[in-house]
């Protein structure tokens, strides 16, 4: 899950996207006979004011965003729970949720971290939703074991080059099967130095900063089906948000 903060006043759009995503996940789970669901939120849940262009386009302040996105995800997890034996949630903060510009910001102080804290309290009565099933290496990465294989989760803002794969394995202090990331606003599956790299897209797609920097983004998420041998299948989940919004002919003059 990435970029669900209602930073453009589009909370209803994101809610409908999450509902569509939920249906896709359930259909895929039924097709493959899936037992457990691992939800990884790899950052940028909250849109802070890290760039002037983002600050201008944010229509909701960060407090409204934290409450709004936390409620969206808690509803999403609660609706997933009847369809799986266990739901495991893991997260790492993204660069969009930092409090200051990159050169001044601490990697240990990001607004995304408040979302998981909120979710734990909100969903404490759901016995099959777990938040402590992963190992936090530091505030920028975590490890989650799925069917005997270790998956390393990062946001990706520190890990853009192929050479970082070996560095991440060294920091994990164990062989890593796959690296899960986000950051670049589109889905991508690759294999680098024998390690799978799985990058998930963004509910938002492109923000004003992406447009200005000519950074490609697509409104999409990713579902992976994992077995004891690793990733058996993956699915691109694309969203056409034009179907969620009033068309020009539907808007009263």
Model region roles, listed by residue range:
Residues 9, 41, 92, 180, ...:
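Short glycine/serine/threonine-biased micro-segments
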